[in-house]
Structure formats: C-alpha cells, structure tokens
C-alpha cells in the first residue's frame, strides 16, 4: 500500500467515529459567547496578528468568516472597511457580534446562522474565505467543496496540531483512554488528493496554560469538552489538580501551535 491508496476523507471519518467528543452542540458555545467576546474581540493576540498579516485583506475585498464566533476577525476586518459575511452555528456568538456591529456601526457586516452541514446556497461568494479554528467538521469533502465554491481568490484555514485541547494528564487522571481529535494532516492530505497543493505554515500561540483559579474552573473546562464526569472521575481530576498545585506545575490546555493552511484559488 502507498499513500495513493489511502482515502484521507474516509480515514478522517473513521477517526471521528472513534473520537466521541469532537462535535459540540451550539448551546455549549452560546454559554461561552459573552466570555469569549470579552477575551478575544479587540484584544491583542499573536495568533490574531499573524493570521491577519497572512491574509492581507484589502479594503476592497470581501471576506467570508466561517465559524466567526463573537467577531474575533469579523470585527477588525469590517472596521477596516472590508465587506464581511460572518457565519456561525451559535446564536449566542452571533448575538455578541450583532452588539459589536451596532456599537461600531459596521454596515458592511452581514451574519448568517449556519453550520458546516447546512445548505449554503444563500451564502455569497467572497474574495477571501477564512475558517479560523473551525475545521473539525463532520465531512471533510463537503467542507472542501463549500470552500472552493465560495472563494474567489484565497482560502485560509487553521487546524489543530495536537490531539487534545485538554492537558494530556487529565485523561490519565480520570481513567479515560481517548484517541483525541484528527489533526491538520488529514485535511492537508485530502486537499492534495483533491488537486489543491496548499501552503502550510504554523502559528505559535499564547495558549498552553490553564486559565482558571480553582478546581471548579478546571472541572468546568473538562466537562465542556468531555461531558459530565462521574464521581470517580471527579475524584481523579481533583487529585490531579491538587498535585499540580502542590508542585507548582502548570496545567497545559489549548493548542500551543496551529496549522495555517492556505492557497490561492485558480478560477479559469
């Protein structure tokens, strides 16, 4: 067998089946929307700065921001005068974005309440298509088809490089074996198989440390990703937290590095 015999879309889906917590319902993001808006929109970030520089969006270019969240990129892009179509499946995120739109008078910003799985016939094409940290999809081929259908000039995606957003020690502490998320390499290889020779860079981030002050904060972050823990699992997590505190060791959540995948669209 060679790499040409592997269907990376099928292999990706097999990985998803083995990964039982990859697809979070929108209500979970609704509850995090206000906090994310406070922490992300308009705040200095090495990740945001590097991605904006890579995209180099001009004021006369339109952008489709897929998985826009509370407006991390939609707001600054609209503020510079670009037309922005912002798409998210969380009403809570879109509500936060609507407040920024009103606050800053962003008349060139339009929102769409949609997921990757929805019909996108009414979503406009754009010069630049962005999917930042929103590429853990159900169907890799469907995502690629949508990206190619909507992009006029350039596509920019960021995808995970680590299999977990949680500290690896969490899983041992609670006694769970977990295969984790499929990483960027599936997407990169499937793009190649679809005839797209994408560019690959990496973005270093400030992530990687637990952002919270208590065991309750840690429990909340773990249950956000994994669902409700059993009492035995909570005991294991508490012991893990106490040990880290006693040894003054950080709890490393998040992706320390993101894969930036991008390409120019060749429209004949």
Swiss-Prot record:
In terms of Gene3D superfamilies, this protein maps to: Vaccinia Virus protein VP39
* Top-level division of the source organism's lineage: Bacteria
Q: Name one Pfam family in it.
A: Methyltransf_25
InterPro entries (UniProt xref): CFA/CMAS (IPR050723), Methyltransf_25 (IPR041698), SAM-dependent_MTases_sf (IPR029063)
**PANTHER family, from UniProt?**
CYCLOPROPANE-FATTY-ACYL-PHOSPHOLIPID SYNTHASE (PTHR43667), FATTY ACID C-METHYL TRANSFERASE (PTHR43667:SF2)
Name of the molecule in the record: Uncharacterized protein HI_1273
């Amino acid at each position: 067998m060679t790499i040409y015999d592997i269907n990376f879309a099928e292999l990706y889906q097999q990985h998803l089946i083995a990964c039982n917590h990859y697809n979070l319902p929108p209500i979970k993001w609704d509850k995090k929307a206000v906090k994310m808006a406070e922490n992300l929109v308009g705040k200095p970030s090495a990740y945001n700065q590097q991605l904006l520089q890579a995209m180099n969006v001009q004021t006369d270019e339109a952008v489709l921001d897929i998985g826009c969240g509370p407006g991390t990129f939609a707001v600054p892009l609209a503020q510079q005068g670009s037309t922005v179509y912002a798409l998210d499946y969380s009403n809570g995120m879109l509500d936060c974005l609507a407040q920024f739109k009103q606050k800053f008078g962003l008349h060139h910003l339009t929102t769409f309440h949609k997921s990757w799985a929805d019909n996108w016939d009414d979503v406009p094409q754009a010069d630049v298509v962005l999917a930042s940290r929103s590429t853990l999809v159900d169907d890799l081929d469907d995502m690629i088809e949508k990206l190619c259908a909507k992009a006029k000039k350039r596509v920019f995606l960021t995808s995970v490089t680590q299999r977990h957003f949680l500290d690896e020690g969490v899983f041992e502490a609670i006694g769970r074996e977990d295969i984790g998320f499929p990483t960027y390499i599936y997407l990169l290889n499937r793009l190649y198989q679809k005839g797209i020779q994408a560019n690959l860079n990496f973005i270093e981030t400030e992530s990687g440390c637990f952002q919270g002050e208590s065991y309750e904060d840690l429990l909340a972050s773990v249950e956000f990703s994994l669902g409700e823990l059993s009492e035995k699992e909570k005991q294991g997590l508490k012991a893990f937290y106490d040990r880290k505190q006693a040894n003054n060791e950080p709890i490393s959540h998040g992706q320390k590095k993101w894969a930036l995948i991008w390409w120019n669209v060749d429209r004949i």
